[in-house]
């Protein structure tokens, strides 16, 4: 189970629903640049947690993020293999009350270190919506360099946006 100084990455459990609803899922600002919608009710949060548990069970490198100090589930982080020796993040998200504490940096560095040390990755890639200045700054702060942009259509919102791609040699 990967961890950082302040965070534990573990598989979701059903009791996470309250923390996740309170800390991230109900916050529109957290979903603004992501490919997910907010969750508003307890019933929806329980159902979403059940889907998360099933998804994480089928994907070895997708985790719920827990703050060590409080024991609360505050977000998620994941990665997947793109090709031989190349791994990439599939999303990092933490609730707004936990932003500005260095947790994003810890998470992205944790993923890259885990990919290199445990999975033999030689390169790690990440991306963000071009309007997401915080994600761009995070990737640059963690030593990633810009590689290219891509226009992406988002079917739920019926919009096209620019995705910026970054990479880091490990």
Where do the PLM segments sit?
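Acyl-donor (CoA/ACP) binding surface of acyl/acetyltransferases
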Residues: 1-19, 23-29, 62, 66-170
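Hydrophobic residues in alpha-helical segments
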Residues: 24-25, 34, 56-57
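Conserved GNAT-fold acetyl-CoA-binding loop/helix
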Residues: 29-51
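A generic secondary-structure signal
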Residues: 51-52, 114
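A short helix-loop-beta-strand connector motif used in the catalytic cores of GNAT acetyltransferases and
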Residues: 52-64
């Amino acid at each position: 189970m990967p961890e950082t100084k302040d965070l534990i990455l573990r598989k979701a459990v059903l009791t996470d629903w309250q923390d996740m609803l309170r800390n991230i899922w109900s916050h529109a600002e957290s979903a603004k640049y992501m490919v997910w919608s907010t969750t508003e009710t307890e019933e929806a949060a329980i159902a979403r947690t059940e889907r998360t548990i099933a998804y994480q069970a089928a994907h070895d490198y997708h985790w719920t993020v827990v703050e060590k100090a409080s024991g609360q589930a505050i977000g998620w982080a994941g990665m997947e293999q793109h090709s031989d020796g190349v791994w990439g993040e599939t999303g990092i998200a933490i609730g707004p009350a936990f932003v500005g504490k260095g947790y994003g940096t810890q998470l992205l560095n944790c993923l890259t270190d885990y990919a290199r040390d445990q999975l033999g990755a030689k390169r790690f890639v990440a991306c963000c919506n071009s309007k997401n200045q915080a994600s761009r700054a995070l990737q640059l702060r963690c030593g990633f360099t810009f590689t290219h942009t891509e226009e992406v259509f988002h079917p739920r919102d019926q919009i096209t946006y620019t995705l910026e791609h970054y990479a880091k040699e490990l």
